[in-house]
Amino acid sequence: MNAALPAFIIVVSLAPSELAWAQNRGVYPLGMSAINSGITAEPGFTYSNLFLYYSRDESKGPEGEVLATGSNSVLMDMSSFVWVSGREILGARYSASATIPIANNSLASDAMGSISGGGGLADSYYQPVILGWRTERAGIRAIYGFLAPTGRFEAGADDNVGSGYWTHVLASGQTLYLTKDKRTAVSAFQMYEFHTTQEGTGVGPGQTISLDYSVMRMVPLSEDMSLQLGVVGYEQRQTTDKSGPGITEEQADARYAVNALGFAGNLGLPARGVGLGLKYYKEFSNRSTFEGYSLQISGSVAF
């Protein structure tokens, strides 16, 4: 079951003069919305818990060259609460959600050793408007959300958990069933992030566009149990330059790019309203950011 809950990742924040290879990414946790992206749940409440682990051991330059090696890891546990209305707006089912993340991060390099780390409440994410349409062979969702800087952030600190800025989001998810029995599905999820200026630094991190996608095949295991298996991937691109005090022309021009492919499985028990999921992604050909892998484990229950 797809709880349709984009939430947000903590941002490792260092001044450019402190560590040139610690480029930021967007704040969306890539890959989490790859499966059943256009599907809206049945009316009622859903609780979802998502555990994400991102591990990166190389920093890539603007041409994809390795600038440094070390470790950048992010652990997140996100509790999401979704309400789906039984009423429709513009022919679409209306829903809303809130996501509260707890996070832990660390950054180290082979040359400099431990650089930063922090843990605690991260930035929370709210989606006051989710509209979902569906036909016999497709589903689509349109979303407005915003990221509130509730995580700890102080300019120059080495234990930040939050980003230090607000983010507004426009997103959409689509799922297309390729077969009449709906056992083969292609899904895509797009998100555009509008970032404000970072508190205490005056830095504008640049805007970001992200894409998650999947091709999944459902295998019935019993009358009340099914398994989805397939291929997943994600992409992310910085669309505008970073700007602000201390940002050089070279740093402003170095827009990050992220690519990943992997595999996933979802176990569904629809009569009980329970879903379990596992995704693994391996990144490749990244530019101006870290490169590594991601493991994501999810569970949800509908009431």
Segments predicted by a language model, with ranges:
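Residues on the lipid-exposed face of transmembrane beta-strands in outer-membrane beta-barrel proteins
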Residues: S37, N49, M78-W83, Y126-G132, ...
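Residues that define the transmembrane beta-barrel architecture of outer-membrane proteins
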Residues: P43, S71-S79, I115-Y125, G162-H168, ...
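Detector for outer-membrane/organellar transmembrane beta-barrel domains
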Residues: I143, R152-E154, D158-I247
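Outer membrane beta-barrel transmembrane domains
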Residues: V27, T201-F303
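Surface-exposed strand-loop-strand hairpins of Gram-negative outer-membrane beta-barrel proteins
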Residues: N24-R25, Y53-M76, D110-G120
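Transmembrane beta-barrel strands of outer-membrane/channel proteins
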Residues: F45-S55, A96-N104, A142-A148, A188-F194, ...
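Short loop/turn motifs that connect adjacent beta-strands in outer-membrane beta-barrel proteins
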Residues: W21-N24, N36-G44, S85-S95, W133-I140, ...
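Extracellular loop and loop/strand-boundary signature of outer-membrane beta-barrel proteins
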Residues: A34, E63-T69, D110-S116, E154-N160, ...
